[in-house]
Amino acid sequence: MKKWEHYEHTADIGIRGYGDSLEEAFEAVAIALFDVMVNVNKVEKKEVREIEVEAEDLEALLYSFLEELLVIHDIEGLVFRDFEVKIERVNGKYRLRAKAYGEKLDLKKHEPKEEVKAITYHDMKIERLPNGKWMAQLVPDI
């Protein structure tokens, strides 16, 4: 079961995702990212975008995944509410393939909040918790 939350971090907003698997934690932190920008509960799954990124480590993989989502948001004006993430290790690198589900931003419907300017490595952590679940977090540039 995945869940997400925002956490206070000085003048910024931290985003944190939890999941039974690493993939679910990545999905949850992506939902948290978009909930910083809009009310994700009002976003419908009308469109899908496929994403593929590779990186040397999990932190770079999370950064690249969220950065790609932010680029799609900026260029196409899409907001997302749900994700299907698959992560595998190939030739010593991590590969992430994902589907992102959402729709075009509607200012009246989606209740815009903050603008996320960039993904950062600030306070980024990806770890397996003592209960066996996974957690991923970071503080984006608002």
UniProtKB/Swiss-Prot annotation:
Outcome reported for the amino acid change (mutating D141A): Impaired ability to stimulate RtcB ligase activity
Keyword Lipid biosynthesis annotated: no
This protein's UniProt keywords: Calcium, Metal-binding, tRNA processing
Sequence positions that bind Ca(2+): D12, D141, I142
Coiled-coil ranges (or none): none
Keyword Metal-binding listed: yes
One of the GO biological process terms: tRNA splicing, via endonucleolytic cleavage and ligation
Pfam families in the record: Archease (PF01951)
GO MF terms held by the record: calcium ion binding
Highest taxon of the lineage: Archaea
Function: Activates the tRNA-splicing ligase complex by facilitating the enzymatic turnover of catalytic subunit RtcB. Acts by promoting the guanylylation of RtcB, a key intermediate step in tRNA ligation. Can also alter the NTP specificity of RtcB such that ATP, dGTP or ITP is used efficiently.
NCBIfam families, sorted: PRK00407.1
Name by which UniProt lists this protein: Protein archease
